[in-house]
C-alpha cells in the first residue's frame, strides 16, 4: 500500500510541474517584449552622419581692440579742519549751591517725621518685648541630690558583736573565769567536806579577784587606743558621717 501511494504522489507532482512550465512558455510566446535599440547602434549612426556632412569655410572672427577709456582725474579736495571744542570751566561748589539751594522743609513736616520715627522705635521695643516673653524660658537645672551610700561593715560573723578589742586581737586566749563560792578549795566541792586546803587559799583568791577587773580595764583602754590609731582616716570620716545622718 505504501509503494502504491508513493508512486501516485510522484506521478501527480510530475504532472503539476509540467503544466506550470508549459503555461509559462506559452504566455511568453504570446506576449513578446519589443526590444529597444541598443546604445552602440545609435552612437554609430550619429558618428556616420557627422562624417557625411559637407565642410563649409568659416571666416575668422574680427579682432576687436580694447580701447581704454581715460577717466577724468578727480580734483583733490583739501581736508576740512577739525573743530576742537572749547573746554568749559567746571562749576565750583559755591556756584552749585547758589544754583540749587536746599529747600528747607516746613516745620509741620519735620514734626510729622519725628513723630513717625518715635512710633517706629516704640513699636520695635514692643515687638522685642513680646518676642522675649514668647520665648520659652529655660528651666533651672536641678542639682543632683547627693545620696550618701551606706557603708557596709567589712567584718561578718560573730566578731562584729565582740567590738574593737576583738578586731585588734582576733585570736586572743581567754583565761579561766573566777568562780566565787568554792567550798574547801575544790572547784566542785561539797559543803560537808572537811579539807583544809580551801581555807588556806581564800586570801589569795580574794586578792586576785580584786586585781583582775582593774587589769581588764587597763588592757581594754590600751587596745582601744591601738585600734583607733590603726583605723584608716577615710573609714573613720565615713563612720562619723554615717552616725551623724542616723
UniProtKB/Swiss-Prot annotation:
Annotated Gene Ontology cellular component terms: plasma membrane
Keyword terms: Cell inner membrane, Cell membrane, Membrane, Protein transport, Signal-anchor, Transmembrane, Transmembrane helix, Transport
Segments in the Cytoplasmic topological domain: 1-7
Compositional bias ranges of the Basic residues kind: 112-125, 142-151
Coiled coil spans: none
Superkingdom of origin organism: Bacteria
UniProt signal peptide: none
Biased composition (Basic and acidic residues): 67-79, 101-111, 126-141, 233-246
Membrane topology, from the record: Single-pass membrane protein
Cellular localisation: Cell inner membrane
Entry's Gene Ontology BP terms: protein transport
Periplasmic topological segments: 29-246
Transmembrane region(s): 8-28
Region (Disordered): 67-158, 183-209, 225-246
Compositional bias segments (type: Low complexity): 188-209
Primary localisation category: membrane
Described purpose of this protein according to its UniProt entry: Interacts with outer membrane receptor proteins that carry out high-affinity binding and energy dependent uptake into the periplasmic space of specific substrates. It could act to transduce energy from the cytoplasmic membrane to specific energy-requiring processes in the outer membrane, resulting in the release into the periplasm of ligands bound by these outer membrane proteins.
Similarity comment: Belongs to the TonB family.
Protein name: Protein TonB
Organism of provenance: Mannheimia haemolytica
Source taxonomy: Bacteria, Pseudomonadati, Pseudomonadota, Gammaproteobacteria, Pasteurellales
Amino acid at each position: 500500500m505504501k509503494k502504491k501511494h508513493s508512486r501516485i504522489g510522484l506521478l501527480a507532482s510530475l504532472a503539476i510541474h509540467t503544466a506550470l512550465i508549459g503555461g509559462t512558455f506559452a504566455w511568453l510566446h504570446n506576449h513578446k517584449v519589443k526590444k529597444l535599440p541598443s546604445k552602440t547602434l545609435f552612437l554609430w549612426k550619429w558618428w556616420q552622419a557627422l562624417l557625411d556632412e559637407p565642410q563649409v569655410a568659416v571666416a575668422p572672427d574680427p579682432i576687436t581692440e580694447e580701447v581704454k577709456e581715460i577717466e577724468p582725474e578727480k580734483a583733490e579736495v583739501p581736508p576740512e579742519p577739525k573743530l576742537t571744542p572749547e573746554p568749559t570751566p567746571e562749576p565750583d561748589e559755591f556756584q552749585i549751591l547758589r544754583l540749587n539751594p536746599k529747600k528747607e522743609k516746613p516745620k509741620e513736616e519735620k514734626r510729622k517725621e519725628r513723630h513717625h520715627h518715635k512710633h517706629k522705635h516704640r513699636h520695635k521695643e514692643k515687638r522685642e518685648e513680646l518676642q522675649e516673653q514668647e520665648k520659652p524660658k529655660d528651666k533651672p537645672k536641678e542639682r543632683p541630690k547627693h545620696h550618701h551610700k551606706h557603708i557596709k561593715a567589712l567584718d561578718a560573723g560573730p566578731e562584729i558583736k565582740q567590738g574593737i578589742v576583738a578586731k585588734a586581737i582576733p585570736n586572743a586566749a581567754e583565761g579561766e573565769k573566777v568562780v566565787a563560792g568554792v567550798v574547801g578549795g575544790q572547784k566542785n566541792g561539797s559543803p560537808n567536806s572537811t579539807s583544809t586546803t580551801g581555807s588556806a587559799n581564800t586570801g589569795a583568791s580574794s586578792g586576785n579577784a580584786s586585781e583582775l577587773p582593774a587589769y581588764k580595764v587597763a588592757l581594754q583602754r590600751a587596745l582601744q587606743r591601738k585600734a583607733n590609731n590603726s583605723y584608716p582616716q577615710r573609714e573613720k570620716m565615713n563612720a562619723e558621717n554615717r552616725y551623724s545622718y542616723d
